[in-house]
Structures are given as structure tokens and as C-alpha cells.
A protein has these predicted regions:
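Catalytic-site neighborhoods of secreted/periplasmic enzymes
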Residues: 99-101, 110-160
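Active-site His/acidic residue clusters
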Residues: 136-147, 169-210
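Short, structured active-site-proximal loop/turn typified by the sulfatase FGly-forming signature C/S-X-P-X-R
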Residues: 54-89, 94
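Structural recognition of the beta-strand scaffold that forms the well-ordered cores
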Residues: 44-48, 72-74, 89-91, 128-133, ...
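Metal-dependent active-site segment of extracytoplasmic phospho-/sulfohydrolases and closely related
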Residues: 45-46, 61-64, 200-243, 276
Length: 298
């Protein structure tokens, strides 16, 4: 009887050790979601709709775009919620305290951003880079040697789209940044969510659609296209911590991007660069604060 009791104790102890080992194995070997598409994208397009609120996209009829995309209408920008600091976060993967741009002012002769950007990382891997912008101050994002082409285009969204499409079809950059100022201009002049503002959103969406169509019809290449904004607005201003100013759309489309998928993870404006680098197969600099929005890929 005593021997039988000892055997039972040893059996229970052994079973406990086996179970403990299985638990430790499960903890040390988690099943992780993929952080990148199975095939690196040939090129990436980043589109900024300056001053575009998510509810404005819905009001202007953006359902056709969301049906093709992985998206969230609850992404957040950085504070201060103004153009230059927010765009710097968009293309660096950093918050303003770490990329150093806190002011919304830049003029020719002033130094550009001092930290590496998406364009630096792409160039280091042999990708060509280009920027089509409708605000001169966004030249602050162009570090020496990081961009092969920078075009400042005056005029409405249609004109900006024409230049972007020309670059896509002729020069085929590996990373293209396109900036539309129409929503922001209409918001300051007429008020956010006013009829002229919503008309500007609709025009810009149509221009975005032309760029998307060009990417979808382009042969010999896979792509990632991200559409987002630097800030929202209320009344005729922005720059505060209010939800109307801080909430932005974040929309991804591409060869290996899920369609009609509402993103569940939290998305910040500075997640944009890590996600693009991941799609292009470019290693993430360890300094990045942003995270890859991995759930968009299949």
C-alpha cells in the first residue's frame, strides 16, 4: 500500500511537470499574426488629404473606396494637430517630440527635418522616391538626397492628380507621396463640414480614385496605397485636442491588402511609415515609435 501511494505521488508529480512544460512552451512560442504581406510590394503610394475628417469622407460618399480597402475612421493624429508636425509624424514614424518639428511654419532657406524619413529608408534600399505636394512648407520633409523629385503643384486636386499619374506612368517611383490641400483650404475659408468643404472632399476623392485606377491597371508590379490625413477641423480652425481635430481616416488598398475590412487595432498617424516599410520589405529602424498595421495584409 505504501509503495502504491508513492507511485501515485510520482505519477501526479510527473503529470504536473508535463503540463507545466506545455504551458511554458505555449508562452515562449506564441502564434503571431503576419506583420507583412507574403510578397514585398513593388512600390508604395502615400496620399494625404489635408484636413479631411472621417465623417466628411462618409458624407461625401466614400463607400466605393472603403469597399476596396482595409480602413479605420478612428485613427488619431498627433498634437499639435496641424499640418507640418503631423506630416512629419506621417513620414518618420515618430511623434513630434522625437522628430523635432513642433511649428507649422517653413520657408525656403530654413533647414529641413533633421531625422530620417520614409524616403531616406527607401533610397537606402535602392528605391526611387518622389513627392507631389500642394503646400510649399511640406518641402521641410525633403532631406538632402532623400527624394529624386519634388514638385510643388498649385491648383485644385485634379491638377495634383495629373502630375502624380504622370510620375506613376513615366518614372515609376518606388515611393510616391501625394498631398492634396483642397479640404484644408475649404475648411479654413468656409468651415469644416460646410457644403464647400464637402465638395472639396468629393473632388479630392475623385482625384484619389484616378490615382488608384492607375495603380490597379499598371502592369508588372504590386503596390500598397495608403490614404490618410494630417488632421481634421472644427469651425474654421484646427490644432486642438478635440476629437474633431485629432480623428483622421486611415485607408489602405493594394495587391495584398484585405478588401472591405474595418481595422480593429488602434492606428496612429505615425504607424504609416512602419506599415509602408513592411510592405516594401524594408527593415524597420529600431527608433520608430509607430507599429505595423499588420492586420490589413493577407
Amino acid at each position: 500500500v505504501a509503495l502504491l501511494g508513492v507511485m501515485r505521488i510520482r505519477w501526479h508529480a510527473g503529470a504536473i511537470l508535463v503540463l507545466l512544460g506545455l504551458v511554458l512552451l505555449a508562452v515562449s512560442s506564441p502564434v503571431e499574426a503576419p506583420s507583412a504581406p507574403p510578397e514585398s510590394a513593388t512600390y508604395a503610394i502615400l496620399i494625404s488629404m489635408d484636413g479631411a475628417r472621417p465623417d466628411a469622407l462618409q458624407a461625401a460618399g466614400a463607400s466605393w473606396l472603403l469597399e476596396q480597402a482595409s480602413y479605420t475612421l478612428k485613427a488619431t493624429t498627433v498634437f499639435p494637430s496641424v499640418t507640418l508636425p503631423a506630416h512629419a509624424s506621417m513620414v518618420t514614424g515618430l511623434t513630434p517630440r522625437n522628430h523635432g518639428i513642433m511649428q507649422n511654419d517653413w520657408r525656403p532657406g530654413m533647414p529641413p527635418i533633421q531625422v530620417p524619413t520614409l524616403f531616406d529608408a527607401a533610397k537606402a534600399r535602392g528605391r526611387t522616391t518622389a513627392m507631389v505636394i500642394s503646400k510649399e512648407k511640406l518641402r521641410a520633409l525633403a532631406r538632402p538626397g532623400a527624394l529624386d523629385r519634388v514638385e510643388v503643384v498649385g491648383g485644385r486636386a485634379e491638377v495634383v492628380a495629373e502630375r502624380a499619374i504622370a510620375l506613376l506612368t513615366r518614372e515609376r517611383p518606388g515611393v510616391l507621396f501625394v498631398h492634396f490641400s483642397d479640404p484644408d483650404s475649404a475648411g479654413h475659408l468656409h468651415g469644416w463640414m460646410s457644403s464647400p468643404y464637402l465638395n472639396a472632399i468629393a473632388r479630392t476623392l475623385a482625384a484619389v480614385g484616378r490615382i488608384l485606377k492607375t495603380a490597379q491597371e499598371r502592369e508588372n508590379g504590386t503596390f500598397l496605397l495608403i490614404i490618410t490625413s494630417d488632421h481634421g477641423g472644427h469651425g474654421r480652425i484646427h490644432g486642438t485636442r478635440s476629437p474633431e481635430d485629432m480623428t483622421i481616416p486611415w485607408i489602405a488598398l493594394g495587391t495584398h491588402v484585405l478588401r472591405g475590412h474595418e481595422i480593429q487595432q488602434e492606428v496612429r498617424i505615425y504607424d504609416t511609415t512602419p506599415t509602408i516599410l513592411s510592405a516594401l520589405g524594408i527593415p524597420q529602424p529600431p527608433s520608430l515609435e509607430g507599429k505595423v498595421v499588420s492586420e490589413i495584409f493577407f
